[in-house]
Amino acid sequence: MITRKQYPNHHVYETEIGGRAFTVETGKVAELADAECICRYGDTVVLTTVTCNPIPKAGIDYFPLTIEFEERMYSVGRIPGSFNRREGKPSERGILNSRIIDRPMRPLFDEELRNDTVVTCTVLANDYDNPVEIVASLGASIAIACSDVPWNGPVATTNVAHLNGKYIINPSSDERDAADCFVCISSTFEKLVMIETEAKEAPENIVYECIRVAHEANMEIVKFINSIVAEIGKPKFTFEKAAVNHELLDDLMAYGLGKIEYALDTPDKNVREERLTAARLDFQEKFGEKYEDFDTHIEVCLYKMQKKVVKKWLLQGKRVDGRGMDEIRPLDAEVGVLPRVHGSGLFSRGQTQVLSICTLNTLSAAQKIDTIYPEDTKRYIHHYNFPAYSTGEARAARSTSRREIGHGALAEKALLPVIPSVEEFPYAIRVVSEVLSSNGSTSQASICGSTLALMDAGVPIKRPVAGISCGLISDQETGEWRTFTDIQGVEDFHGEMDFKVAGTTEGITAIQMDLKNKGLTMEIIADALERCRKARLEILSEVMLKAIPAPRPEVSEYAPKMLSLKIPVDKIREVIGSGGKTIQKICADTGAKVDIDDDGSVFISAVDSAAAYAAKKMVDDICFVPEVGKLYYGKVVRILPIGAFVEIAPGHDGMVHISKLENHRVEKVEDVLNLGDMTWVKFMGFDEKGRANFSRKDALKEMANQ
């Protein structure tokens, strides 16, 4: 006898988000995971699981948290396009979604937790209209909050779009694309912990309001999650925090805090590192024999000493390099720094330096995307490379990191609103940003460098884009806080916020905010937005526009020459020809490449303009349709007893009947026209068989009356 499996811990919870039902189901699947839930929003469904190793990992000084965002092609009813028809490594957007989940959650874990923790979000169904990253983020928050892993959550995540004067919660893909401002916000009940923004030069007040609306929606979601935790949440396990030799720390503070202050008090990163190394050697000589565990604890002690100094100085309005709180490091911008490439820009901000290179190609070079999202091609691509030498490290090159993918996507998002349409500029565009030197804010430097490279390449961008970052330091006991402009490496490392804002003179195009504290108030957000606005305008006017005031009028001589035109859809077959013979002949005769879309868009590329225009003329000739009543100048290509055939365009001829040759009776066609003669004719229309009929007589009469 078979017994039916029971699910005694099965629970279903439901709330409403953005006017649509959001359902959470637990206790039915993945029973061996520490916690799990299936979240459904419309027809988007995500399974989230949490597993945690009960034994702490030895020999590390960080919390080993891993967020896995698993895309499944069956979720959209498709089979993967790979050779073995299996999902491979995560897509770029999948990696970005895992970062969206990771970034708001990580600061809320105890930094001294050492247990391997893995959160896996598997997309089971995706309807495109209900954002999968939101469902996964909420599922991760619910699963961790209900697990026994210590965490200071929950957090909620909401998308908001500003479209036609309205603020839409969790917009569909179409609404997101049409919106002038789109934000993804994660927050606890009290504070914001993550901001992602993409906008079409939106003013700061619109961005601020989007953030506020999202935070209000998140507050209600946090209440909902807390109600679930109250019913089924597990008690959190206790753990032994990483031991710190407080006696050693006290001795170091008393003896060496002044040495740390001296080491940090310089604008030069190399000098700072040399001084810190000297201080460490001095400490080892002084206390190495006294404390047997000196080597075990010295790095933690040095970190705490540096953090104390940086925090004290910043709260006092002092920075390690002597700048004011709103002062930007020395800037420099150059264009045309490389030969042969289509466009290049070198942007330097203090000891941060980025070289960006722009490459133009035919639209067939656009990136093909095989994912669970609606987008299937990408015409504008930005790649960001962060080699070890940029920070002075001796480390071999490795595969592209998630950080590099994230920074590349941020720069891509920042510049996309100013990239011309395919009709205005029918090129595929790739920009690569090479970080040559890193001392903070390389992602924002890559945005500035990429703008320079695009303009140098002759890409007619709407307006230049610049990026700047803003930092934060606060005192949790007093509530005091200070923001500061253009953070450098040591301020990023010991500070609490990296608030990156990119935009033009007209408004914001992208924001990314990362935190190391427990969250921000809306007051801090408003302050950071205004601080970044002022700095952005200064960078554009004082440096970038002086390097290159406007995009170059022509693309590089080494770039392919592109033309675009539109033909009737019913003419596509004629242009392609039987088995592709016609289009192949066009390419062979001119040396150009011709691509045709299903909507009749034709894109022609060639190494020089003459070849491109020759191919365009051949396409125009094939698609030529005469207008009734219009005069045409053509060549006699054939003579019959009943009339002459006149070709008015390559491949387009028609008959002039003998009765239509002259105003008087004509006995013989050759009395008026001979083979090869040029003559004016008037198009009279097509007969029932689709044959063109011309009249020379009517053409001459009309010309005589003009």
PLM regions and their residue ranges:
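Conserved phosphate/anionic-ligand binding catalytic regions in large, soluble enzymes, centered on
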Residues: 35-37, 130-148, 335-358, 439-459, ...
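Single-stranded RNA-binding regions, centering on S1/OB-family and related RNA-binding modules
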Residues: 558-562, 569-706
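Long, basic N-terminal domains or extensions that often function
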Residues: 2-240
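Long, charged amphipathic helices and adjacent flexible linkers at domain junctions
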Residues: 235-246, 538-565, 613-633
